[in-house]
């Protein structure tokens, strides 16, 4: 039984110990009220001294970042517009350059054709002048040939006449006849 008595006193001690501990967990009302008031004061002070300045600083920083983002967006849009404008100007310049090249090629072709035409005209003119010169030389050669033939014929006639007894008048007649034939 003694054992039972020890067991029951231990149980009572344990029950009291647990009750004391639970009673120690809950503070007294005045301490709890003082803690609550001091926590509220601390919360108000921290809000005024730390939270509001930190919140204001964060808002300023957020506004600064947003302004930078907006500015960057505007700059990107502006640079895209300038890029598009420069691409259009480059395209216009290429079109103008191609037009200038085509015009230059057409002009060069015209100059080439005119030069070829002028050269052909000059060669035709030179050919005509050469033909005229050749005709003149032929006529001159024919006249000179006839003249030489007449002279040779005259000399031969004189020889023949001198060997024969034909009169001098007949020889003059032959010379006149040959000379008239040459002048025609």
UniProtKB/Swiss-Prot annotation:
It is found in: Cell membrane. It is a single-pass membrane protein. Coiled coil: none annotated. Signal peptide: none annotated. GO terms for cellular component: plasma membrane; proton-transporting ATP synthase complex. Keywords: ATP synthesis, Cell membrane, CF(0), Hydrogen ion transport, Ion transport, Membrane, Transmembrane, Transmembrane helix, Transport. It comes from the Bacteria. Disulfide bonds: none annotated. One of its GO terms (molecular function) is proton-transporting ATP synthase activity, rotational mechanism. CDD domains: ATP-synt_Fo_b (cd06503). The chain crosses the membrane at residues 25-45. F-type ATPases have 2 components, F(1) - the catalytic core - and F(0) - the membrane proton channel. F(1) has five subunits: alpha(3), beta(3), gamma(1), delta(1), epsilon(1). F(0) has three main subunits: a(1), b(2) and c(10-14). The alpha and beta chains form an alternating ring which encloses part of the gamma chain. F(1) is attached to F(0) by a central stalk formed by the gamma and epsilon chains, while a peripheral stalk is formed by the delta and b chains. HAMAP family: ATP_synth_b_bprime (MF_01398). Belongs to the ATPase B chain family. PANTHER family: ATP SYNTHASE SUBUNIT B, ATP SYNTHASE SUBUNIT B', CHLOROPLASTIC. F(1)F(0) ATP synthase produces ATP from ADP in the presence of a proton or sodium gradient. F-type ATPases consist of two structural domains, F(1) containing the extramembraneous catalytic core and F(0) containing the membrane proton channel, linked together by a central stalk and a peripheral stalk. During catalysis, ATP synthesis in the catalytic domain of F(1) is coupled via a rotary mechanism of the central stalk subunits to proton translocation. This is ATP synthase subunit b. The gene is atpF.
